[in-house]
């Protein structure tokens, strides 16, 4: 958005397909097009390997871009952009990925290249109609506290046990009337946590969201009063929707849970910091 405003034009972005960016950035007025980078961990994506690189060069070349900003230190992407005949290529310093600060590096890059001072507060834009439609469909009421629980996560060490969420739900419900919206993925371990919560005493006050696309969950999240999430995609989404978001940091660098002023990280008992292999759940 900052680049779009500075250059007074819409921008196209290239992002990994599994980022689901098309589902939560599709209403951003600053974005002209979202181009999917089809690469995966199994190296079987459409853009993996030498032939995949050639395909990506051809696709980018067809867009006839005249300027690009590369938010990583990859020589591969530098060469791809040059071979796609993009004349004006701006990029992080090559071969400097180690110990890069995910937020500060981007801010320094934009400041150096475009004299931009960008605040670390990403925001997701939603149509007011979608927010109101979700409010009616799911019967949101101001007499209740509507709480998003981001109970899923990309790895076992990031997922807080169901029992912890259940205890929290019981304590909240003893104070005031609450509704809980359960956001998670659909892998086996995530569904085990989901089903344990649904089988608890407060299961009747829950609405599960695992059957919805991310784009369908956003208006629901926007209607919530607060969000309590593992370090998962839903913590980032709810904070970007300006919902106060408590992030349960168990096994991920603290940076991922406090870069947005709407995030309030909680660390494991006895820990002053958290990073990979803290194993704090």
Task: Label every PLM stretch briefly.
Residues 1-281:
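Catalytic machinery of carbohydrate-active enzymes
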């Amino acid at each position: 958005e900052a680049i779009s405003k500075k250059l007074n034009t819409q921008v196209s972005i290239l992002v990994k397909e599994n980022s689901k960016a098309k589902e939560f950035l599709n209403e951003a007025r600053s974005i002209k097009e979202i181009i999917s980078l089809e690469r995966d961990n199994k190296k079987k994506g459409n853009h993996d390997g030498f032939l995949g690189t050639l395909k990506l060069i051809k696709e980018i070349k067809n867009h006839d871009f005249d300027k690009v900003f590369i938010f990583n230190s990859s020589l591969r992407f530098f060469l791809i952009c040059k071979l796609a005949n993009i004349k004006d290529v701006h990029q992080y310093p090559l071969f400097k990925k180690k110990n890069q600060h995910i937020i500060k590096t981007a801010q320094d890059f934009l400041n150096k290249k475009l004299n931009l001072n960008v605040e670390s507060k990403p925001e997701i834009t939603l149509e007011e109609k979608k927010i109101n439609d979700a409010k009616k469909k799911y019967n949101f009421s101001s007499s209740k506290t509507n709480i998003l629980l981001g109970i899923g996560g990309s790895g076992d060490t990031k997922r807080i046990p169901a029992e912890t969420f259940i205890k929290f739900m019981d304590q909240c419900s003893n104070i005031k009337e609450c509704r809980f919206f359960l956001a998670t993925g659909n892998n086996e371990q995530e569904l085990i946590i989901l089903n344990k919560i649904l089988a608890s005493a407060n299961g009747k006050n829950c609405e599960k969201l695992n059957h919805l696309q991310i784009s369908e969950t956003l208006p629901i999240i926007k209607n919530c009063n607060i969000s309590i999430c593992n370090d998962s995609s839903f913590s980032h989404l709810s904070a970007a929707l300006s919902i106060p978001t408590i992030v349960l940091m168990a096994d991920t660098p603290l940076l991922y849970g406090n870069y947005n002023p709407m995030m309030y990280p909680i660390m494991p008992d006895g820990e002053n910091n958290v990073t990979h292999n803290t194993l704090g759940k």
